[in-house]
């Protein structure tokens, strides 16, 4: 990455962190205003604006990093998704374990502490989905056609535009939520079948990929489960379960991962036979 691009990358990362910090501060003040019955409230617009900007700048930073990466090793790219996923889910589960430990203490009812930890969880989730999205994008665009490239460009724009749904109060089970998220999921499903990279893996690499993708799916499901649990048990200013953008991203990651698993499994026998025949030819020569 050149110095100019690195500067943009650092700016995006810095802005995403700054938006997250301001979002946390405003949410804590909102909670305090409700508890103390203070009449001065921060308009919800600013909360959703900061949340949206945090999402946007995080995604732009990973987009820039992915576009300038020269790594062509597909297995290493899957490792990148897994390692960042493992790192984020470890801290997320640690937060959950910490809340479990203090469950019978006075801290368990501290709404400030709960929301601080929840905002840390938001940051971890955004990092995971942004990294996974752009790694899968890069892999799916391997040996791309012009149509595939345009289709992915449209999908990426639709994904980023879905961030604007933060400004609307959409319930997870509501019809507007389904109407907005359903086309994104269907579009993601169609794009997920462009898996030319699978053919360039040998038998051993395919098994490693199957293991890594399975773990990525488990990480995604664990994050979604935590989002649901926090929605049911905690009082939150920002609730991710009603966030079209985040839930659509998890839908894309799980769909893309599941289809990749199926394709890898179906390609295992052909890889084994090809490598065996290739070995016989080399011995004969």
Feature locations, PLM:
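N-terminal membrane topogenic signal
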Residues: 1-19, 77-80
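Juxtamembrane segments at transmembrane-helix boundaries
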Residues: 2-4, 31-39, 53-82, 87-234, ...
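Hydrophobic transmembrane alpha-helical segments in integral membrane proteins
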Residues: 9-18, 36-53, 118
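Short hydrophobic alpha-helical membrane-embedded segments
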Residues: 12-21, 151-158
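Hydrophobic alpha-helical transmembrane segments
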Residues: 41-47, 114-117, 239-253
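Short, charged amphipathic alpha-helical "coupling" segments at sensory-output junctions
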Residues: 265-282
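Short, hydrophobic-rich beta-strand element in sensory/regulatory alpha-beta domains
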Residues: 285
């Amino acid at each position: 990455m050149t110095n100019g691009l690195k500067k943009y990358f650092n700016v995006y990362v810095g802005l995403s962190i700054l938006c997250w910090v301001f979002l946390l501060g405003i949410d804590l003040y909102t909670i305090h205003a409700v508890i103390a019955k203070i009449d001065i409230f921060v308009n919800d617009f600013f909360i959703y604006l900061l949340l949206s900007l945090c999402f946007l700048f995080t995604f732009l930073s990973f987009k820039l990093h992915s576009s300038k990466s020269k790594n062509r090793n597909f297995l290493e790219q899957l490792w990148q998704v897994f390692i960042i996923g493992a790192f984020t889910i470890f801290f997320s589960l640690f937060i959950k374990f910490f809340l479990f430990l203090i469950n019978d203490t006075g801290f368990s009812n501290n709404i400030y502490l709960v929301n601080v930890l929840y905002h840390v969880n938001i940051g971890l989730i955004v990092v995971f989905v942004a990294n996974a999205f752009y790694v899968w994008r890069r892999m799916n665009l391997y040996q791309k056609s012009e149509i595939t490239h345009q289709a992915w460009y449209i999908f990426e724009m639709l994904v980023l535009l879905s961030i604007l749904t933060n400004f609307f109060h959409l319930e997870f089970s509501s019809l507007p939520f389904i109407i907005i998220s359903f086309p994104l999921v269907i579009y993601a499903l169609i794009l997920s079948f462009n898996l030319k990279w699978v053919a360039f893996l040998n038998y051993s690499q395919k098994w490693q990929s199957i293991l890594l993708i399975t773990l990525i799916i488990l990480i995604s499901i664990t994050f979604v489960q935590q989002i649901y649990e926090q929605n049911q048990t905690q009082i939150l200013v920002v609730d991710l379960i009603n966030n079209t953008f985040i839930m659509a991203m998890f839908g894309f990651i799980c769909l893309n991962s599941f289809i990749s698993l199926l394709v890898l499994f179906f390609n295992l026998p052909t890889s084994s036979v090809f490598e065996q025949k290739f070995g016989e030819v080399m011995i004969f020569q």
